């Protein structure tokens, strides 16, 4: 399944070369534009199936699925549908109207939450989301990411007491594409 996912990433034109500023603030000569992939039903089904199977193999038990907006929302939604587990959406900032929530969906103390993300570089966005879940007394039982850029996310996430499970490492992706990230 990993090879199939890498093929879809490559065929979807997700790897872009040029000069980019990433969410982390880092500059990069390549960008993984996963949005074209996560708007593809076939890819979303595959990603959800992979996360479901990997989490089962690892013995990770969870009650709810969560993802930070925007990129992780389609992934979390697909996984919620695949597993029949309720969905949580972590907002980038508190709503300034209505309820002012940071989390959309029902969350209760003690909920075991599987967090998903599209791409990680330093892990800042997903760490923030995990901390918001912890503030609501939920337990983050694991973090799955579609592509890890291998630029410190795993180490930073583990320093915060969470575990990262990448479906694809960027080094494997570039090798499969037959290109260099330099």
Swiss-Prot record:
<feature type="binding site">
    <location>
        <position position="149"/>
    </location>
    <ligand>
        <name>orotate</name>
    </ligand>
</feature>
<dbReference type="InterPro" id="IPR000836">
    <property type="entry name" value="PRibTrfase_dom"/>
</dbReference>
<comment type="similarity">
    <text>Belongs to the purine/pyrimidine phosphoribosyltransferase family. PyrE subfamily.</text>
</comment>
<protein>
    <recommendedName>
        <fullName>Orotate phosphoribosyltransferase</fullName>
        <ecNumber>2.4.2.10</ecNumber>
    </recommendedName>
</protein>
<dbReference type="InterPro" id="IPR004467">
    <property type="entry name" value="Or_phspho_trans_dom"/>
</dbReference>
<dbReference type="GO" id="GO:0019856">
    <property type="term" value="P:pyrimidine nucleobase biosynthetic process"/>
</dbReference>
<dbReference type="GO" id="GO:0004588">
    <property type="term" value="F:orotate phosphoribosyltransferase activity"/>
</dbReference>
<dbReference type="Pfam" id="PF00156">
    <property type="entry name" value="Pribosyltran"/>
</dbReference>
<keyword id="KW-0808">Transferase</keyword>
<feature type="binding site" description="in other chain">
    <location>
        <begin position="117"/>
        <end position="125"/>
    </location>
    <ligand>
        <name>5-phospho-alpha-D-ribose 1-diphosphate</name>
    </ligand>
</feature>
<dbReference type="GO" id="GO:0000287">
    <property type="term" value="F:magnesium ion binding"/>
</dbReference>
<feature type="binding site" description="in other chain">
    <location>
        <position position="92"/>
    </location>
    <ligand>
        <name>5-phospho-alpha-D-ribose 1-diphosphate</name>
    </ligand>
</feature>
<dbReference type="InterPro" id="IPR029057">
    <property type="entry name" value="PRTase-like"/>
</dbReference>
<keyword id="KW-0328">Glycosyltransferase</keyword>
<feature type="binding site">
    <location>
        <position position="95"/>
    </location>
    <ligand>
        <name>5-phospho-alpha-D-ribose 1-diphosphate</name>
    </ligand>
</feature>
<comment type="pathway">
    <text>Pyrimidine metabolism; UMP biosynthesis via de novo pathway; UMP from orotate: step 1/2.</text>
</comment>
<comment type="subunit">
    <text>Homodimer.</text>
</comment>
<feature type="binding site">
    <location>
        <position position="97"/>
    </location>
    <ligand>
        <name>5-phospho-alpha-D-ribose 1-diphosphate</name>
    </ligand>
</feature>
<feature type="binding site">
    <location>
        <position position="121"/>
    </location>
    <ligand>
        <name>orotate</name>
    </ligand>
</feature>
<keyword id="KW-0665">Pyrimidine biosynthesis</keyword>
<dbReference type="InterPro" id="IPR023031">
    <property type="entry name" value="OPRT"/>
</dbReference>
<comment type="function">
    <text>Catalyzes the transfer of a ribosyl phosphate group from 5-phosphoribose 1-diphosphate to orotate, leading to the formation of orotidine monophosphate (OMP).</text>
</comment>
<dbReference type="GO" id="GO:0044205">
    <property type="term" value="P:'de novo' UMP biosynthetic process"/>
</dbReference>
<keyword id="KW-0460">Magnesium</keyword>
<feature type="binding site">
    <location>
        <position position="91"/>
    </location>
    <ligand>
        <name>5-phospho-alpha-D-ribose 1-diphosphate</name>
    </ligand>
</feature>
């Amino acid at each position: 399944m990993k090879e199939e996912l890498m093929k879809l990433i490559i065929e979807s034109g997700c790897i872009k070369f040029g000069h980019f500023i990433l969410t982390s603030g880092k500059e990069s000569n390549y960008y993984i534009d996963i949005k074209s992939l996560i708007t593809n039903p076939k890819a979303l089904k595959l990603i959800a199936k992979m996360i479901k199977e990997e989490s089962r193999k690892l013995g990770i038990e969870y009650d709810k699925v969560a993802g930070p907006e925007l990129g992780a929302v389609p992934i979390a939604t697909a996984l919620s549908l695949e597993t029949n587990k309720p969905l949580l959406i972590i907002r980038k900032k508190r709503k300034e109207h209505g309820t002012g929530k940071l989390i959309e969906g029902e969350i209760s103390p003690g909920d075991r939450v599987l967090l998903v993300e599209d791409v990680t570089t330093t892990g800042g966005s997903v760490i923030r989301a995990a901390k918001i879940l912890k503030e609501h007394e939920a337990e983050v039982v694991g973090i799955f990411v579609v592509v890890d850029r291998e630029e410190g996310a795993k180490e930073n996430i583990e320093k915060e007491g969470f575990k990262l499970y990448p479906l694809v490492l960027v080094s494997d992706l570039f090798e499969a594409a037959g290109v260099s990230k330099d």
